[in-house]
Amino acid sequence: MTGKELNKIVAAILFASLIAMIVGFIANILYKPNLHVLHRGYSIAIQKSSSNESATVIAQESVNIQELMKTANANHGREIAKKCLMCHSLDKDGPNKLGPHLWNIVGRPKASITDYKYSFAISKLGGVWDDENLFAFLHKPSSYAPGTKMSFAGISKPQDIADVILFLKNYVHDQ
């Protein structure tokens, strides 16, 4: 291959690149992209709660937690709480799994297990896990503490939540 042939090959590559660029510019001039985003379907506006107090108020307005606690069944709560054992331990000095251990959770300060790394959403809550706070959290964790790393969707039936809370209260005394 001589110098002339090499020059012809390089010139052909440069010329082809130039043609491709020119065609691209012309295409952009002729065909303007649609910059308007179309929203398909019907969207429903959802009002998100920004604080745990409003989530607690919403939970308290819709159900009377103390009345539910009077009729709560700890044995039924034990069955429902089996879902929790996938990510939590119930043992007194049990290991922290995906979530912190739940030993003596009722009445315990929030984010108080020192060897567990809580999400920022839970760390900033403050207060204690009483019946009302546990009820609101177990009903829908993502509404109670937006940004929590707990991926559990929640327990939909209010009586089931009361049963779980009673089970957690009694579990400490049964051991």
Curated annotation (Swiss-Prot):
A Pfam family that the UniProt record links to this protein: Cytochrom_C
Q: Cytoplasmic side: which ranges?
A: 1-8
Q: Name one GO molecular function term.
A: metal ion binding
Q: Which residues lie toward the Periplasmic compartment?
A: 30-175
The family annotation for this protein states: Belongs to the cytochrome c family.
Membrane-spanning ranges:
9-29
Describe how it is modified after translation.
Binds 1 heme c group covalently per subunit.
Residues the record lists as binding heme c: 84, 87-88, 150
Chief location of this protein within or outside the cell: membrane
Q: What is this protein called?
A: Cytochrome c homolog
Q: Single GO cellular component annotation? A: plasma membrane
Free-text function comment from the UniProt entry: May be involved in electron transfer from bc1 complex to aa3.
Report which superkingdom the organism of origin falls in.
Answer: Bacteria
Gene name?
cycM
Q: Where in the cell is it found?
A: Cell membrane
How is it placed in the membrane, per its record? Single-pass type II membrane protein
Species of origin? Rickettsia prowazekii (strain Madrid E)
Q: Which UniProt keywords apply?
A: Cell membrane, Electron transport, Heme, Iron, Membrane, Metal-binding, Signal-anchor, Transmembrane, Transmembrane helix, Transport
